[in-house]
Design a protein with these regions (language model features):
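Membrane-embedded alpha-helical bundles that constitute the cytochrome b-like, heme-associated redox core
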Residues: 2-291
């Protein structure tokens, strides 16, 4: 009997131990879930703590962006509309050329985040930025104060494509109805080449614009970061970690407002200069040759 009692006690201990063992994962998993929820909520609170709304994109830059978008759409529509819209197509081309000229000057003389020196980086930074595209942006924050390494070079590529499109259009001709203002200034073979470039570059430009729109959509749906809103209002929510970074040129800390002075007078002067240059460019073109 003593042996039987001892055996019964041993069985009872093993059964109790098994019950405790089977219950432990449930308790630990529930604790892990709770701690994970608490950690996520604390990270969210920390990410929103100290976030300040800062004016990043100045008004001249925003006006340029949307005016260029309209001119590109207008150029495309009038090119497809036929001969009756040829003059309007050229007007959209001149507008695009003027806008690109303004942006190039604004990239040298404009406010902090409009300047090329503040967002054009080396290949290492671009590769690192590409690897971070899959990461979600913390709620209420942004990935970069101004252009990121990828976005900076993407904007330069788009500017180069639009510039190529506008300049080549000055020399093209269909040999029957219309000709660019400087068609007679070049040889027929060069004009033919520039005509080919104008049409080929347009397809490349369309692909680049499509990629641009896809990237914006990915940021909105994948990274949960709205890029369209700041280009309308100019404002971004800047976290403390981003606020203490330096610009690429290391001339202005991010703790200072991106638009540290009223840029409107400077933008107006540059826009006026560009307008005069475009008008002179068109009106001083050589007279077309007639046979």
């Amino acid at each position: 009997m003593p042996h039987a009692k001892t055996a019964m006690k041993a069985i009872a201990k093993k059964t109790k131990a098994k019950r405790q063992h089977t219950r432990m994962p449930d308790n630990s998993s529930s604790k892990e879930e709770v701690s994970s929820i608490e950690e996520d909520s604390s990270l969210k609170e920390e990410s929103q703590l100290g976030v300040t709304e800062t004016l990043v994109w100045d008004l001249p830059l925003r006006l340029f962006h949307w005016a260029l978008s309209l001119s590109l759409v207008g150029s495309w529509v009038t090119a497809e509309a036929g001969f009756d819209w040829t003059e309007t197509h050229f007007l959209f081309g001149y507008t695009a050329l003027g806008l690109i000229s303004f942006r190039l000057l604004w990239g040298l003389l404009g406010t902090a985040h409009a300047r090329f020196s503040n967002f054009l980086t080396g290949p290492k930074a671009v590769i690192n930025a590409l690897g971070q595209l899959k990461q979600k942006t913390p709620p209420g924050e942004v990935s970069h104060v101004g252009h990121g390494p990828v976005g900076g070079w993407a904007s330069v590529v788009l500017l180069a494509l639009v510039l190529t499109q506008a300049v080549s259009g000055l020399f093209i001709s269909d040999d029957i109805f219309y000709a660019g203002p400087y068609n007679s200034a070049v040889s027929s073979s060069l004009a033919d080449y520039l005509g080919w470039l104008h049409h080929t570059n347009f397809n490349i430009l369309l692909a680049a614009i499509a990629l641009h729109l896809i990237t914006i959509t990915w940021y909105l749906l994948g990274k949960k970061e709205n890029l369209i809103g700041p280009m309308l209002t100019g404002n971004k929510n800047i976290s403390p970690s981003l606020a203490h970074r330096k610009t690429q040129s290391k001339t202005q800390p991010m703790t200072q407002p991106a638009v540290y002075s009223n840029p409107l007078w400077r933008g107006f002067l540059i826009a006026s200069f560009v307008l005069v240059m475009i008008v002179l460019l068109v009106n001083l073109a050589p007279e077309p040759e007639y046979f």
